[in-house]
Amino acid sequence: MRRLWTVGCFSRLIARHFSSVARRGERPGGEELSRLLLDDLAPAQRLERLFGLSPCLLALRAARRRVARLLLQAGKAGLQGERAELLRVAEARGIPVLRPRRQKLDALCGYQVHQGVCMEVSPLRPRPCDEAADTSSGDDPQQLWLVLEGLQDPRNLGAVMRSAHFLGVDRVITSQRNSCPLTPVVSKASAGAMEVMDVFATPDLPGFLQAKAQQGWLVVGTVGCPGPEISQSSKVPITSCLEFVWDRPTLLVLGSEGSGLSQEVFASCQLLLTILPRRHLPPGLESLNVSVATGILLHSICSQKKGFPVQERGQLLQDS
């Protein structure tokens, strides 16, 4: 017990020393001290390493994760701008700040593109789907929820979340089964949007869709460029995303990268949207990457959003 107490005190003392000189960009304590801090005092279980400037900064601002320590690459000139803000926020919250060399930080981040920034944090988990209804605005006829079934590529999921946040999607719902968890790779691919969005998960996606349809929501599935055989065999009407009219609360449902929507989810859809190509396509090129398709579909729908103040639009144009 005394040994554990001594190690704990030493760790806190060293962490304070690192934080006090972090502003100056120095590498305190030498290589041996850094190796002790980063290897021997390994992160506690159930922590993960979040990497990248935007994910780490947005995670600190949102304060939804527990942060064990912040790692800033040694030798980064000046710690200005967002890196300086990272340091200020971390020190204000008493978060230890370490300054490893790039080679060490590369290894800690699994050789991902980390931009000289990494944080050891508690994971983010999707919230139960019943909480989505509790926090929604039921009287808004132009609510748009994005529903994802079985997306497994973390970079696709991150890119989808980035587009959803940018274009004003109200909720993101995922299937619990066969879906990518909310990992640091997802957060990096989302440019940190994952850190500020509420993501919900349901164990019964077809049941969820059917329940929302009974509440008056329109369940809209998605399909690749339909050939004549698909158009004739489908019992669900198919329309171009450019012809879709958004006049009631809508669930936009996208399927997995390989197989698309499952039969159960497909059967729950009341309408199918497609993106029509601008040329004849050879076999194998009839569809788009799911994150690209999501951006196009969301933009075509969200451009119909009513009630966006003229003054606010003008301010956004001026700021850009």
Curated annotation (Swiss-Prot):
Gene Ontology CC terms, in alphabetical order: mitochondrial matrix; mitochondrion
Predominant location category: mitochondrion
The protein's role, per its UniProt record: S-adenosyl-L-methionine-dependent 2'-O-ribose methyltransferase that catalyzes the formation of 2'-O-methylguanosine at position 1145 (Gm1145) in the 16S mitochondrial large subunit ribosomal RNA (mtLSU rRNA), a universally conserved modification in the peptidyl transferase domain of the mtLSU rRNA.
Enzyme class: transferase
Highest taxon of source: Eukaryota
Enzyme Commission numbers on file: 2.1.1.-
GO molecular function, one term: RNA binding
UniProt KW Metal-binding keyword: no
SUPFAM superfamilies per UniProt: alpha/beta knot, L30e-like
Transit peptide start-stop: 1-17
Subcellular location: Mitochondrion matrix
Protein name (record): rRNA methyltransferase 1, mitochondrial
Keywords: Methyltransferase, Mitochondrion, rRNA processing, S-adenosyl-L-methionine, Transferase, Transit peptide
Gene3D superfamilies: 3.30.1330.30, 3.40.1280.10
Family: Belongs to the class IV-like SAM-binding methyltransferase superfamily. RNA methyltransferase TrmH family.
